[in-house]
Amino acid sequence: MKKKVQEIVNTVFVGDSRDVLKDYPDKCVDLCITSPPYWGLRDYGVDNQIGLELERDEYIGELVRVFDEVHRILKDDGTMFLNLGDSYSGSTGRSGGISEINSKARQLKTGAYKDLRPSKVDGVPPQSLMQIPSRVAIALQYSSGWIIRSKIIWSKTNPMPESVDNRPTKSHETIFFLSKIPTGYYYNQEAMSEPAKNPNSGDPWWQRKLYGEPSRHGLDGAAASGAGNFRTGELRNMRTVITLPTNSYKGAHFATFPPKLISPFIKGCSREGGIVLDPFMGSGTVAEVSKKLGRLYTGVELNKEYHKLINERTSQMEMFI
């Protein structure tokens, strides 16, 4: 029997999202923000968990099962922000996709790092980027008819180092913005806006230093600090590249979604009092930020130890509202 809406709000269920979401009522959530487990990099000690599939396409198929359910329980004017990591075929270490969110944030006693991927993947040359995010997005188009409205790049200013000497270090993550309908979904453009860059100001100091300027000599105060790069009070439509550092939570020993990354998504794509879903809740950042912004949250997490952390984060946050 399907649960009632009041039974899912401000609740994180311990279990497998493929099973738990089946009990959610149709069209009950307004927004989904999530980051699924990496393929083959984590073992939580639970049979048939997502991420331990022997084949890449099987992994993609299991994610499709989850997001078919998300499509069903999302309201017609709802949307989803899906953060996905990639892998290299034949590699034997972290591949640098959702490094902070999955290589760290999903590391507890039952989830220590392991590379469980096969050394070869059919149809993919060794050491090739497998394009898993794009493959998943395309599969979602054909399964439930998800509409890919945008591909957002989160450019990290503090990426995890990689021991590679034959390719650039991965310093970004992919976030797909998807909807159920082509137009008419809820989207508050003002809430999704960002400060407008001032073309008349100089490059900020860090950019000058990056491209060879050795000092701040000759720069005015605004240019030296970078503050002059934005017009006070003027906004522009959000760009598809978001530059932010990773974030850490004082109650955990890992990095998480930066609240600044997902706050505009929650404010811009859900109304106050709306329900925000995360079927792979992890450390609970989506729940915490949703509650702080006056939304309800709901979600699923496989690891029982994370459930304790999520409850701690949301209860501590209440003291500051």
Show which residues each predicted segment covers:
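Core catalytic lobe of class I
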Residues: 2-319
